[in-house]
Amino acid sequence: MFQDNIFNQWIYNMNRRNFIKRVGLLGAGYALNKNLMFANSGVASTATSFSSFPTVRKPISERNFKSPAIEKAITTFKQKVKNEELCWLFGNCFPNTLDTTVFYSEKDGRPDTYVITGDIDAMWLRDSSAQVYPYLDFMSEDKNLQRLIIGVINKQTSFILKDPYANAFYDDDTKYTRWNSDHTEMKPGIHERKYELDSLCYPIRLAYGYWKKTNDASPFDAQWKKAIETVLRVCKEQQRKHGNGPYSFRRTSEWAIDAVPMGGVGYKVNPVGLICSTFRPSDDATIFPFLVPSNFFAVASLRQASEMVQKITKDNVLADELL
């Protein structure tokens, strides 16, 4: 099986990993408890009153998307947390994605959501997933918010099918990027074509989280299944058991972080089953292509995809291949 092929050599570490995980959870719980004690202690912040903090949210009329459930969550937070600076910070940061970076529409009667990073008019598969993930818990209170997230899933599906090796895309399929001179298979509608393994994992994480919260399988149609098959194909290609695969990347640049050695495919690896990632989540080129955290992420994501494929599409062959 695919997953076993990657990580059989790491099974013996499971007990150690469980121990580290438990110790980490205990430490995190202790730190969280201390932070909550501080938050509720009424300790004076650097400002004297809540009114002295600047308002940085857009005016209501200029916000890209409005969610009553999110506004309610902000109000509840302010009622329960006494520290005014934390309340101010949460009230400005938590809704920022909805206020400033999402653009909801419908295409062919289906939700379609374009999510920019904030400073660049482009949608990263990784960033967009992480930007909306905190809102999953509020979908049951706000059906429009749920449709917005369905739109993100639909958009990501279309992007993966367009080019699974690209990391960032435009809403406009005809738009050309400043990186169009990169030495790789650039297409219109693609902002950047840096292959990052985690970029293919994040959309699965979002889809799985949505499905578990709602039990709604409507976004997971034949196109979505095709996207999952595409992700699996890329993972197999980048195990590099039969050559370097179809992807390469070079850029004319003075910055080493954008330079991929060995003709744009990276340094050679011993094909042991791990998946190569040409770039890190930071968009910087890897020196050692076996990026271990992203490989762990891939195992978790492929397991999630397998569960969804088996239960939603009933394709047991693909479900087994994903494991």
PLM features: residue spans?
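Internal amphipathic alpha-helical repeat/solenoid segments
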Residues: 98-124, 145, 188-189
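Well-ordered alpha-helical scaffold segments within catalytic/enzyme domains
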Residues: 69-82, 130-143, 202-217, 296-314
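Twin-arginine (Tat) signal peptide motif
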Residues: 12-20
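Acidic/His metal-coordination segments adjacent to aromatic residues that form catalytic metal sites
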Residues: 108-115, 176-194, 257-290
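Catalytic cores of carbohydrate-active enzymes
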Residues: 163, 167, 236-253, 288-290, ...
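Aromatic-rich carbohydrate-recognition surfaces in CAZymes
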Residues: 121-149, 153-256
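N-terminal export signals
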Residues: 20-41
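C-terminal segment of N-terminal export signals and the immediately downstream linker at the start
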Residues: 8-13, 34-63, 68-71
